[in-house]
């Protein structure tokens, strides 16, 4: 009888030790389903009844309690290795909770296993890699191997205050560079220059503009030769037809129309040059005159035939792009504009048209 009591007492003490080991793990919730134990043994499992004999109590606790503890440690070790970031050790911030072993298999998808990068803004300027590692704790660096860890770090650290600065943790996205095309408010390819307030046309070409000064023979006003021709390569309008040329020749000077009469065509128009374009100023001072940017300047001495053709009066005539035009009517100051190009002339004329 004494031996039987000692054996029974020893079996009861041996059965109490595994119960104390199983209490921190709270294995009553998930250990029985893993080992296939029926549901009726789940409730009396932590507290065995005293009427059980030694032969039945000891094998039950020996076979049922220790294997769940070992499988639980293996599973927690696997979870810990899954959450470990390369180059850093995990801390209690990233340790799995009691409910994670049940939900972890559902979260381990292909998207969750891909690396994920977080963008942390508004952090102190003195922060370096050790500071970031200390701030993120067990999450390691900002670049995570597991997308679930990155999401958990973002939810935990977003909006926190570090040294008086509220940091923001968001998902880093790839920056896409796009070439935005400017909207042209004008039709037919005309473009507006906001600096000078002018409208440029893409259909202008670099033609030749002749500013002819024809002096009367024996005039005492000028001591220069009988005729000077000021030539400059300048963008002008292409004149494909007479109707279009007539429309452009009726350009306004200070709101007034000026008709240019043709005498003869000098040569065929040169090919278009897209780099240079004519310009129509919309400013009130210039009116709606048609101007052109200069590409080069040069002086040329005209032939005697050209000098004789322009020797009837003292005036400057604006010649269109592909033709030499002279105004046979009297040119007065009413139709003239101050020209900024008078410094390029050999001799200042009494009046001048602005090209």
UniProtKB/Swiss-Prot annotation:
Keywords attached to this entry: Cytoplasm, Methylation, mRNA processing, mRNA splicing, Nucleus, RNA-binding
PROSITE patterns: RRM
Polar residues bias locations: 70-112
Compartments (UniProt record): Nucleus; Cytoplasm
Pfam families for this protein: Fox-1_C, RRM_1
Region called Disordered, residue ranges: 1-123
Modified residues (Asymmetric dimethylarginine): 298
UniProt record, GO biological process: mRNA processing; nervous system development; regulation of alternative mRNA splicing, via spliceosome; RNA splicing
Domain RRM: 116-174
GO molecular function: mRNA binding
A single Gene Ontology CC term: cytoplasm
Site (Interaction with RNA): 117, 125-126, 141, 165, 175
Subunit structure comment from the entry: Binds to the C-terminus of ATXN2.
Functional note: RNA-binding protein that regulates alternative splicing events by binding to 5'-UGCAUGU-3' elements. Prevents binding of U2AF2 to the 3'-splice site. Regulates alternative splicing of tissue-specific exons and of differentially spliced exons during erythropoiesis.
Name this protein carries in UniProt: RNA binding protein fox-1 homolog 1
